[in-house]
């Protein structure tokens, strides 16, 4: 173990005497170096603050000159927090004595992490009320500094269910109607976490029932998460039935703080006087809650109970609230339509599958196609069908969800990427199942695979149309890899000449985009790289793949394309010891003597132990023109500007 690591470990374990011994007699510069970051990004002071070793913290600051503001990486609950100052770590862990000590020694009370989280937010997250009181009461910590998502200290306290911290923040003037980047408020966080007491507290402080960026009210948020207690409280009988938002709440006009914050929560107005819920909103909340009971709680009888109440409210007083008529019935939902009468509703009890379709229909109507839960539960239902062997039904639902995601989410959304990967894994399983069972297995058709492959290419096209190109982002690389896996599977399906033509057209669309993955890899580079195999938890295709390489070459992939290290696909194939693929690339016109940034040819990268290296004769593929190009490069003969551009590119290749 080196000295740097030994110092860090001593600070981690709180071994002050050992730490003093390790640092004794060393010069200032050496001590500064030893107190710097270790390989994981942490520092001795940061880890000592995280672990609550007060004596070590004070020794490092007072005797060794460690900076109280030096940030680093620290781990909490399995997550790595980047750019965390020692005060943040001590606050998050609830070590009040260390917090006091660091602040007395000049630590900034509002210093943030890389994600803009303050020490106060860290203390609010895990419910350290004593630390919160000290930071705010003694050092005037800013209550309103939000993290990079616009999420405030009050919001996280509400979400985590820390009632006393929420009460204290409200007493100190926290803005109760502050919105995050996605438009949600502290009320939304209460509704999502099921914290009814805090929700009552916020409502008493004039919290408004606003809609977030997805159009969700706190009432709908409670329905989506299945918190029946919140839903029941918010839809209780009101003296009047106003709108959920957009109307002035009592008291707002007379008091400036009514819509902002509440200084005395104990004197809060009762809920009934400030936030009435309309009949329509109550109906939707109950219907959505029923859908949650079906898909999340898997309680069909509980769902039916909530849907009955919603139906009663729709017909209340003879003033019927009709459901909107669907524009068209959906194949993925088995052409189901929402029930509209009590008789139709009661008939569902004999048809559990129809109840599940009702849940999907209700969720799509109320939340809309852009809400993540809509497509998530469609995919979930499809997965349940797949688990029971009903692959056709699964594929229909997943295709519908994928169309929804591509039409409503940004390109390369993690949810869309997950859909593509799920398709690839499902298709791989079905093909293996068919191979094992013969005619008894499901017949996976060309249209199924081709449809998803085409949508995958469309996703790449959408990503490349963004103002900022994705470059070598991991998500973009994964998207290309999944397309190659789908192509790998498609090669296992028999095609007619017209289907073969359609497949080649789609691959040509991909190549025309000229997408580049990690390290500037083209699709052809990725097809000859074994790393492309690792795309998900389950194996789909095996790479390098000669079949995929041949399809790419047939569709016009450039065998001499270069990555950021000037490697051609031939170089990558050689690094992966694939002589058969090298032969295919050479036959397609790849230059055997092309050199990379390290002046190595593909032949030189081949494993010398391979029999193929001894049988492969590079001079069989080298022309006089190639030898001349290498001679010019080797002898540093100036040629740029003196010869045609095509020849310049040819020389640079060598």
Swiss-Prot record:
Q: Where in the cell? A: Mitochondrion; Cytoplasm
**GO MF:** EP4 subtype prostaglandin E2 receptor binding; molecular adaptor activity; ubiquitin-like ligase-substrate adaptor activity
Q: In which family does this protein belong, per the annotation?
A: Belongs to the fem-1 family.
Q: Which Pfam families match?
A: Ank, Ank_2
Q: How does it assemble?
A: Component of a CRL2 E3 ubiquitin-protein ligase complex, also named ECS (Elongin BC-CUL2/5-SOCS-box protein) complex, composed of CUL2, Elongin BC (ELOB and ELOC), RBX1 and substrate-specific adapter FEM1A. Interacts with PTGER4. Interacts with NFKB1; the interaction is direct.
Q: What broad taxonomic lineage does this protein's source fall under?
A: Eukaryota, Metazoa, Chordata, Craniata, Vertebrata
* Gene Ontology annotations for the cellular component aspect, listed alphabetically: Cul2-RING ubiquitin ligase complex; cytoplasm; mitochondrion; ubiquitin ligase complex
Query: What function does this protein fulfil?
Result: Substrate-recognition component of a Cul2-RING (CRL2) E3 ubiquitin-protein ligase complex of the DesCEND (destruction via C-end degrons) pathway, which recognizes a C-degron located at the extreme C terminus of target proteins, leading to their ubiquitination and degradation. The C-degron recognized by the DesCEND pathway is usually a motif of less than ten residues and can be present in full-length proteins, truncated proteins or proteolytically cleaved forms.
Which biological process annotations from GO are given for this protein? Answer: negative regulation of inflammatory response; positive regulation of inflammatory response; proteasome-mediated ubiquitin-dependent protein catabolic process; protein ubiquitination; regulation of ubiquitin-protein transferase activity; ubiquitin-dependent protein catabolic process via the C-end degron rule pathway
> What is this protein's gene name?
Fem1a
Q: Where is this region: Disordered?
A: 241-265
Q: Where are ANK repeat segments found?
A: 2-31, 40-70, 82-111, 115-145, 149-178, 182-211, 214-243, 519-561, 565-594
Name this polypeptide is given = Protein fem-1 homolog A
Primary location class = mitochondrion
């Amino acid at each position: 173990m080196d000295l740097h690591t030994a110092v860090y470990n001593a600070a981690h374990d709180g071994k002050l005497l050992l730490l003093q011994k390790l640092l004794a007699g060393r010069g200032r510069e050496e001590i500064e170096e030893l107190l710097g970051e270790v390989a994981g990004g942490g520092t001795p002071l940061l880890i000592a603050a995280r672990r609550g070793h007060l004596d070590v913290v004070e020794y490092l600051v007072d005797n060794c000159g460690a900076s109280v503001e030096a940030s680093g990486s620290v781990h909490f609950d399995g997550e790595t927090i980047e750019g965390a100052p020692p005060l943040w770590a001590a606050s998050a862990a609830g070590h009040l004595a260390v917090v006091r000590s660091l602040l007395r020694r000049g630590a900034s009370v509002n210093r943030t992490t890389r994600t803009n989280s303050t020490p106060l937010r860290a203390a609010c997250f895990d419910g350290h009320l004593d630390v919160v009181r000290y930071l705010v009461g003694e050092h005037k910590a800013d209550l309103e500094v939000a993290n990079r998502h616009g999420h405030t200290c009050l919001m996280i306290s509400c979400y985590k269910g820390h009632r006393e911290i929420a009460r204290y923040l409200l007493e100190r003037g926290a803005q109760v109607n502050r919105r995050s980047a996605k438009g949600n408020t502290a009320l939304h966080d209460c509704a999502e976490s099921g914290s009814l007491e805090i929700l009552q507290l916020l409502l008493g402080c004039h919290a408004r029932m606003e809609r977030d960026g997805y159009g969700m009210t706190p009432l709908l948020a409670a329905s989506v998460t299945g918190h029946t207690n919140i839903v029941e409280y918010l839809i209780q009988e009101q003296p009047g039935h106003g709108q959920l938002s957009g109307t002035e709440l009592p008291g707002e006009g007379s008091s400036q703080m009514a819509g902002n914050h509440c200084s005395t929560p104990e004197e809060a107005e009762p809920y009934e006087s400030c936030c009435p819920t309309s009949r329509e909103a109550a109906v939707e909340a109950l219907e959505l809650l029923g859908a949650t009971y079906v898909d999340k709680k898997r309680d069909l009888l509980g769902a039916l109970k909530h849907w009955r109440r919603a139906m009663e409210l729709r017909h209340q007083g003879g003033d019927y609230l009709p459901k909107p008529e669907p524009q068209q019935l959906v194949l993925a939902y088995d052409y189901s339509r929402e029930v509209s009468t009590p008789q139709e509703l009661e008939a569902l009890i004999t048809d559990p599958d129809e109840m599940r379709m009702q849940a999907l229909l209700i969720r799509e109507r109320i939340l809309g196609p852009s809400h993540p839960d809509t497509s998530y539960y469609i995919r979930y239902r499809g997965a349940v069908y797949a688990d029971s062997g009903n692959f056709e039904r699964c594929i229909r639902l997943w295709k519908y969800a994928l169309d929804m995601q591509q039409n409503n989410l940004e390109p390369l959304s993690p949810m869309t990427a997950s859909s593509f990967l799920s398709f690839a894994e499902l298709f791989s399983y079905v093909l293996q199942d068919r191979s094992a069972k013969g005619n008894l297995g499901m017949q996976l058709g060309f249209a199924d695979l081709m449809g998803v492959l085409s949508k995958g290419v469309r996703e790449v096209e959408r990503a490349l149309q963004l103002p900022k190109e994705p470059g070598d982002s991991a998500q973009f690389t994964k998207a290309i890899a999944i397309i190659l896996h789908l192509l790998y599977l498609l090669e296992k399906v028999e095609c007619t000449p017209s289907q073969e033509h359609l497949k080649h057209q789609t691959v040509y669309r991909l190549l025309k985009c000229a997408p580049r993955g990690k390290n500037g890899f083209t699709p052809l580079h990725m097809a000859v790289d074994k790393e492309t195999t690792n795309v998900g938890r389950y194996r789909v295709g095996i790479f390098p793949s000669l079949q995929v390489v041949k399809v790419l070459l047939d569709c016009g992939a450039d065998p001499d394309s270069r990555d950021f290290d000037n490697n051609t696909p031939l170089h990558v194939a050689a690094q992966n010891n694939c002589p058969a693929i090298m032969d295919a690339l050479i036959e397609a016109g790849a230059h055997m003597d092309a050199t990379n940034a390290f002046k190595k040819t593909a032949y030189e990268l081949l494993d010398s132990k391979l029999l193929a290296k001894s049988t492969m004769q590079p001079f069989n593929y080298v022309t006089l023109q190639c030898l001349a190009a290498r001679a010019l490069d080797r002898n540093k003969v100036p040629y740029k500007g003196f010869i045609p551009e095509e020849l310049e590119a040819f020389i640079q290749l060598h």
